[in-house]
Amino acid sequence: MPVQIFTSIGIIDPGYNNKMRKRLRRLERIWVDWPTYFITTCTFKRRPILASNEVARILADEWCDAHNRHGWIIGRYVIMPDHVHFFCRAELDAKKLSVFMRAWKQWTSKRIARELNFSGTVWQEQFFDHVLRSSESYSQKWDYVRQNPVRAGLVASADEWQWQGEVESLML
């Protein structure tokens, strides 16, 4: 029977569909273990300003402080000329990932401007995050990511790329 018939005889409330739509919201995910995120973020207009010892030191310093400031543990990272890749995991009292990323970009931007006399926008607003699923491992993703400088023709082997490292171990 059409919905109009049920509505006309009072079996279905006319606002039923709207009420259901308002109640059917996406539920928050519940994790047994805290997930590991793979993050990629790019410089504004993809300017190649990151691959230097000075910038690498600033980024690594701020990643080291992320645990105390924001409750995020940073694992391995690769700094490319115009983007960075890193892995991270939240602690129990961590700030939201978007809040952490916004703050990290602000802190690194301020330090790059102050310490390196850089003017202009450092980062794009957005970032890419991917939760590592059970079918993919941290080490497999890391092996792929650390080959980026090789694929970009910057070095012959991944071990030659000097702007990579690990802040804390995320291995389970």
Name the predicted role of every residue range.
Residues 1-172:
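Short catalytic/metal-binding and nucleic-acid-binding patches
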